[in-house]
Amino acid sequence: MHILLANDDGYLAPGLAVLHAALAPLGRITVIAPEQNHSGASNSLTLQRPLSIYEAREGVQKGFRFVNGTPTDCVHIALTGLLDEKPDLVVSGINQGQNMGEDVLYSGTVAAAIEGYLLGIPSIAFSQLHKGWEHLDAAARVARDIVERAIATPPVEPFLLNVNIPNLPFEHIKGYRATRLGKRHPSQPVIAQVNPRGDLNYWIGAAGDARDASEGTDFHATAEGYVSLTPLQLDLTHRSQLEALAQWLN
């Protein structure tokens, strides 16, 4: 078993190191991650400059490769040029903070898994609710269990899973739920600030609260103490509007 491991928090992130340690007994693990944090990078590729690959020489990250680019860059480089043979699975995470509802459109963590899926590899994105890396050991245990299940009996072929793990001690996690994406309210307005030079700058506002957290959603499952597993697809076609659009064109 060969697993390609990536993230969006950067190669020094605790979530990556803990996930690597949890998955290492399962087989060969290749790590390629961004040099710096790229949260919110979505599926962006770096096209305006060349990319470089480096290798960490010390610490728990020893042997990790890192790229001066985005999460999608990392997986794309690995699968189309760096690796001699394609891995059996792409795993992204563990992200610091949830990726639920519309978050998946912005998430670099999910984007890394999407790139693996686009290139024909089953892929899983793992995120832990809230920030601060509390109970990260529990999240890693959950991630390993899901990866082991996916290896032993793939749910479908190929698959793209978005997994969100409650920020709880392992013994307090109630189990797993297959979920759909919930929905958020619009994000908070941008925050305007004047810098010391008198220039007006803007910070992107916080994500909106859950708008659809009804039963069956990722928001509901995690709020109840369950791990949410959401199967994702990449076809954004609004099929129910096709006929109306065709009539409008005529």
From Swiss-Prot:
UniProt subcellular location: Cytoplasm
Reactions catalysed according to its record: a ribonucleoside 5'-phosphate + H2O = a ribonucleoside + phosphate
Cofactor: a divalent metal cation
Keywords: Cytoplasm, Hydrolase, Metal-binding, Nucleotide-binding
EC class of the enzyme, as a word: hydrolase
Keyword Repressor: no
Entry EC number(s): 3.1.3.5
InterPro entries, per the entry: SurE, SurE-like_Pase/nucleotidase, SurE-like_sf
Cystine crosslinks: none
One family name in Pfam for this protein: SurE
Family: Belongs to the SurE nucleotidase family.
Entry function: Nucleotidase that shows phosphatase activity on nucleoside 5'-monophosphates.
Database matches in HAMAP family: SurE
Protein name: 5'-nucleotidase SurE
